[in-house]
Swiss-Prot record:
S-adenosyl-L-methionine binds at residue 288. Signal peptide: none annotated. Pathway: Mycotoxin biosynthesis. Pfam families: Methyltransf_2. One of its GO terms (biological process) is methylation. Transmembrane segments: none annotated. It comes from Cercospora nicotianae. Its EC number is 2.1.1.-. The active site is at 339 (proton acceptor). Induction: Expression is positively regulated by the cercosporin cluster-specific transcription factor CTB8. Expression is also affected by nitrogen and carbon sources and pH, and is also controlled by another transcription activator, CRG1, previously shown to regulate cercosporin production and resistance. This is O-methyltransferase CTB2. O-methyltransferase; part of the gene cluster that mediates the biosynthesis of cercosporin, a light-activated, non-host-selective toxin. The perylenequinone chromophore of cercosporin absorbs light energy to attain an electronically-activated triplet state and produces active oxygen species such as the hydroxyl radical, superoxide, hydrogen peroxide or singlet oxygen upon reaction with oxygen molecules. These reactive oxygen species cause damage to various cellular components including lipids, proteins and nucleic acids. Belongs to the class I-like SAM-binding methyltransferase superfamily. Cation-independent O-methyltransferase family. COMT subfamily.
């Protein structure tokens, strides 16, 4: 990850900006990729180790530019600018609800009155004009006198339905939930319960978000949520392939008597199947809700069915007995599970995995590990804390620092020991390896620590 830029004067920050811009320009030029442009999508650069220089340079540009803006604004104007940021989401709520972008030609222009007429529902030309012009002020639309031209940013709301779903989720569901955090605290205190979050307070009900999504009139929001999760996971920093190819030595688990990998809350088994394809000596069991594992079992490729099984299971209950050979270990793999839950319930989930854990077994959590203050660039740090606040407002869940994970591991019986945290290059989720307290992993297994390139020890950032 890019380290924090510590420059604190105008010319030092400008130099950082020029240096990082030069590196990004050089990388794109060498790869024969287009340079950044307001008139075209961003260059398509795969998230992998080979392209690390590009992403490092891009992060450094954003970090230096944001520092520069804060510096020249000064503290008072920085606070005032921040106080108006919610207005952007307010405009976006109107844009998403009435699908303004769908009523603008992909190539060409239209008028505010034509958009209002196409939308109907009592939407006036004045409302369209005011919200469009506000969005245009931060680059989402481009306006011309008497008409409105669709700018490349908003084309994505028409051509990329998964991104549209994520933006909808942010503006229409998360924005009111975040605003209702103080109301929820006033009603319930600082709660560990999912039905006492900002989300429930924002809709005037004591209800958990996922419970609300299962109600008949919550189906649209549930569908948008599913699309948003699919979109954020596809090819980006949350892509599940980072868990498969991101530096964890899965091949070592096949040594000796081998391991059974139990994918706890594994959905339809996409991660287990990808691992099974790559590591033919390992066996897998996918656990999830009955209807989910039925889909997984149906879609599992025939050549994997002998090594990938499916079982309905509630991860708040004890693990069932597993058929293992003499000496064969068990790996309990849980991806993106704990962050949905407060410490109270995350501890209960880990406790069910700790009970019955043997010295040859281990737990691998695939979760965000929030860096401690000052360890990474401010943009990265803010992004991690943004995710944490999303979990708080929607579910009373939490993205955790390494020390927060360790506190959970120390609180269960038997106690657990954090062995290492591996952070895949360009991936957002770390691989957190845990064993019984007192277990020493073989020296060979300990050879991969921190980043996928084997540096930085257990911290991984």
């Amino acid at each position: 990850m890019v380290k924090r830029i510590e420059a604190d004067n105008l010319f030092e920050l400008t130099a950082e900006l020029v240096s990082a811009s030069s590196k990004l320009h050089k990388f794109l030029d060498q790869k024969n990729l287009p340079q950044p442009s307001f008139d075209a999508p961003a260059p398509s650069v795969a998230l992998n180790s080979a392209n690390k220089p590009y992403y490092d340079a891009r992060s450094a540009i954003v970090e230096a530019a944001e520092q520069l803006i804060r510096l020249v604004r000064g503290p008072r104007d920085t606070l005032l600018a921040l106080s108006f940021e919610h207005c952007a989401t307010a405009s976006m709520q109107v844009v998403f609800k009435y699908k303004f972008a769908n009523h603008i030609p992909l190539h060409g222009s239209t008028t505010y009155s034509k958009i209002a007429e196409a939308v109907g529902d009592g939407v006036t030309t004045a409302l369209v004009e005011r919200t469009i012009q506000h969005c245009a002020s931060f680059g989402l639309f481009e306006t011309i006198p008497g008409a409105m031209l669709l700018q490349c940013y908003l084309v994505l709301l028409v051509t990329d339905p998964d991104l549209e779903a994520w933006m909808y989720l942010s503006a229409v569901i998360a924005y009111p939930a975040g605003a209702a955090i103080p109301k929820a605290v006033e009603q319930y205190g600082v709660s560990h319960e999912a039905d006492e979050s900002g989300y429930g307070a924002s809709i005037g009900r004591k209800i958990a978000q996922f419970q609300r999504f299962r109600e008949p009139d919550g189906k649209k929001d549930h569908e948008m949520f599913a699309r948003a999760m699919r979109g954020i996971a596809a090819g980006g920093a949350y892509d599940f392939r980072h868990a498969v190819d991101g530096g964890y030595p899965w091949h070592l688990l096949a040594e000796g008597a081998g391991h059974l990998v139990v994918d706890v809350g594994g959905g339809p088994g996409h991660v287990a199947m990808a691992l099974a394809e790559k590591y033919p000596s390992l066996r897998f069991q996918v656990q999830d809700l009955p209807e989910t594992v039925q889909v997984g079992a149906k879609n599992c490729p025939e050549h994997l069915k002998s090594r990938v099984s499916f079982q309905s299971h509630d991860f708040f209950t004890s693990q069932p007995a597993h058929e293992v050979q003499d000496g064969e270990g068990i790996v309990y793999f849980a991806r993106f599970i704990l962050h949905d839950w407060s410490d109270k319930y995350a501890t209960k989930i880990v406790q069910q995995l700790a009970t019955g854990l043997r010295p040859q077994d281990r737990i691998i959590l695939n979760e965000v590990v929030v860096p401690e203050a000052g360890q990474v660039g401010r943009e990265t740090e803010r992004r991690m804390h943004d995710r944490d606040l999303l979990m708080l407002m929607n579910l009373n869940g939490r993205e955790r620092t390494q020390s927060a994970f360790e506190a959970i591991f120390a609180s269960v019986t038997p106690k657990l020991r954090l062995q290492r945290v591996i952070h895949p290059e360009q991936g957002e989720l770390s691989l957190i390896e845990v064993t019984l307290d007192g277990v020493e992993l073989p020296a060979q297994a300990n050879g991969v620590n921190g980043h996928a390139n084997g540096t930085n020890g257990v911290n991984g950032h």
